[in-house]
Swiss-Prot record:
The keyword Nucleus applies. This is Protein CROC-4. GO terms for cellular component: nucleus. Expressed throughout the brain in the thalamus, subthalamic nucleus, corpus callosum, hippocampus, substantia nigra, caudate nucleus, and amygdala. It is found in: Nucleus. Residues 48-59 have a biased composition (Low complexity). GO terms for biological process: positive regulation of transcription by RNA polymerase II. Residues 46-71 are annotated as: Disordered.
Length: 156
């Protein structure tokens, strides 16, 4: 007998696997992917911390649908899912130039098939194209707000 939480985890895992499978067969697959930040993360929530360069000026947002590298690292050479479990104050500005993002590349890596336990009210998803998958959630049930950012990367 499945618990509701198990079913949500199972559905989320299958959704992520399907999105990555779909992007791997996309005729337009190349060295770039479309990435957009979670719309519910306000600029005020992206406060600087010891892991960020507070001296750099905030970048101006790109228009929706603009293309760039994955935003996590320009050195990625394989299709993968990058996972950044961070405190809200440590969320990297995915609109910033790529060299500012590389410091977040080694924080965490994930893998296909990993289970994520979350409830419907914690889950917010968006997918801008078959080349990229973005998914993030804010956990309001804990005092520490966790942010998960998954990005589908294309081979360079």
């Amino acid at each position: 007998m499945f618990l509701t939480e198990d079913l949500i985890t199972f559905n989320l895992r299958n959704f992520l696997l399907f999105q990555l499978w779909e992007s791997s067969f996309s005729p337009g697959a190349g060295g770039f992917c479309t990435t957009l930040p979670p719309s519910f993360l306000r600029v005020d929530d992206r406060a600087t911390s010891s892991t960020t360069d507070s001296s750099r000026a905030p970048s101006s947002p790109r228009p929706p649908g603009s293309t760039s590298h994955c935003g996590i690292s320009t050195r990625c050479t394989e299709r993968c899912l990058c996972v950044l479990p961070l405190r809200t104050s440590q969320v990297p500005d995915v609109m910033a130039p790529q060299h500012d993002q590389e410091k977040f590349h080694d924080l965490a890596y994930s893998c296909l098939g990993k289970s994520f336990s979350m409830s419907n009210q914690d889950l917010y998803g968006y997918s801008t194209s078959s080349l990229a998958l973005g998914l993030a959630w804010l956990s309001w049930e804990t005092k520490k707000k966790n942010v998960l950012h998954l990005v589908g990367l294309d081979s360079l």
